[in-house]
Curated annotation (Swiss-Prot):
This is Enolase. One of its GO terms (biological process) is glycolytic process. It is an enzyme of class 4 (lyase). The gene is eno. One of its GO terms (cellular component) is extracellular region.
Length: 421
């Protein structure tokens, strides 16, 4: 029987230069795999907890304690186990932690091991990770949401909304969709430069200039799509991530960049106006995570017209998603493995969403690495969409390049952008 022979974690840096956990699992047959845990900037209050060291080292953001938990407590429990029983391995770590939010061992410790075990098991069986986790039915290449203009917590500018994204929905295969997206991205840069805008990049590779309001970035994206030779609304559509919890204060939505303070109803009306004017097909976190009444208003007004994605709202947590299903709010969920903390729990949440006709969007975090686990995971779970930043910066393109590799390897791969909306 093949078993887990060694588990080791060390501290490495993410794309923002902050420490994170890298877990490495070695099996008795010599198979070995590592996984690097991502970290978010705008985080939901109900997310599983990253364990940070505090103190002066790395300005308090060190993860040596989380690594120590892997190398002692977790390793002692899992060494000798079969790597192929992912659910049992994850459950043992959950029991060992014993807290609702994984604050004892740290979600960053637990997830690193969970991912590394899955990858080591796949290597042992000489299977690609997506095939190991998804089986024979893992065939769908996700339609990317490419964050090409950054605002909010992802950029140092006056734009309130956090992400302005393009979705190449009008193409027949992933490679062509990605090519078109890259062309729009580079065309956008030329337009910004021509108008004297700064083209510094935000955390996720998008441009982060100042604009006069929250609508102007959309105008630039439309121009870039057209100048690149594509049709807005047909070949390439637009998605927004408002990350509105970041500007929700005392029951109101404060759009500082526009000097406006809006109620939930007024904010929803603003979104309806934008959707009527531009080819917007998806809005993420349109209202704040604690504003369930606002979410109901948003869903009732726009839920039959566009995709409404819950990120901070659901935090990849099946219990919170179940509440949303029962209340009839949102119609899609963002899937971030580090919000919940294990591979198995992430898969459970995806299955619950899909059973209830909620779309699933696999997602990176703003603090990423060269680890492309989520590319395989998106295909394994037949998530129809993926968010992993602009087609720039190595940690973002690692995911796109892996998806290109997967697309070439699957006979009969499906790209369903045209059928999403």
């Amino acid at each position: 029987m093949i078993f887990i022979e060694d588990i080791f974690a060390d501290e490495v840096l993410d794309s923002r230069g902050n420490p994170t956990v890298r877990a490495t699992v070695t099996l008795s047959d010599g198979s070995r795999a590592s996984a690097i845990v991502p970290s978010g900037a705008s985080t939901g209050v109900n997310e599983a907890l990253e364990l940070r060291d505090g103190g002066e080292r790395y300005l308090g953001k060190g993860v040596l304690k989380a690594c120590e938990n892997v190398n002692t407590l977790i390793a002692n429990e899992l060494i000798g186990m079969s790597p192929y029983d992912q659910a049992e391995i994850d459950n043992i770590m959950l029991e060992l932690d014993g807290t609702e939010n994984k604050s004892k061992l740290g979600a960053n410790a637990i997830l690193g091991v969970s991912m590394a075990v899955a990858r080591a098991a796949a290597n042992s069986l000489d299977l690609p990770l997506f095939r190991y986790l998804g089986g024979a039915n893992a065939l769908v290449l996700p339609t990317p949401m490419l964050n090409i203009i950054n605002g909010g917590a992802h950029a140092d500018n006056d734009v309130d909304l956090q992400e302005y994204m393009i979705m190449p929905t009008g193409f027949d295969d992933f490679a062509e969709a990605l090519r078109a997206s890259s062309e729009v991205y580079h065309t956008l840069k030329k337009l910004l430069v021509a108008d004297g805008h700064n083209t510094a990049l935000g955390d996720e590779g998008g441009f982060a200039p100042n604009f006069k309001n929250n609508e102007e970035p959309i105008e630039y994206i439309i121009k870039a799509i057209e100048k690149a030779g594509y049709k807005p609304g047909e070949e390439i559509t637009i998605a927004l991530d408002a990350a509105s919890s970041e500007f929700y204060k005392d029951g109101k939505y404060v759009l500082a960049g526009e000097n406006k303070t809006l109620s939930a109803e007024e904010l929803v009306d603003y979104y309806a106006y934008l959707c009527g004017k531009y080819p917007i097909v998806s809005i993420e976190d349109g209202v704040a995570e604690e504003d369930w009444e606002g979410w109901k208003i948003l869903t009732d007004k726009l839920g039959d017209k566009i995709q409404l994605v819950g990120d901070d709202l659901f935090v990849t947590n099946k219990k919170i998603l179940q509440k949303g299903i029962e209340l009839g709010v949102a119609n899609a969920i963002l899937i971030k493995p580090n919000q919940i903390g294990t591979v198995s729990e992430t898969m459970q949440t995806v299955r619950l969403a899909q059973r209830n006709n909620y779309k699933t969007v696999m997602s990176h975090r703003s603090g990423e690495s060269e680890d492309a686990f989520i590319a395989d995971f998106a295909v394994a779970l037949n998530c129809g969409e993926i968010k992993t930043g602009a087609p720039a910066r190595g940690e973002r393109n690692a995911k796109y390049n892996r998806l290109l590799e997967i697309a070439r390897s699957i006979a009969g791969a499906e790209y369903i952008g045209k059928d999403l909306f």
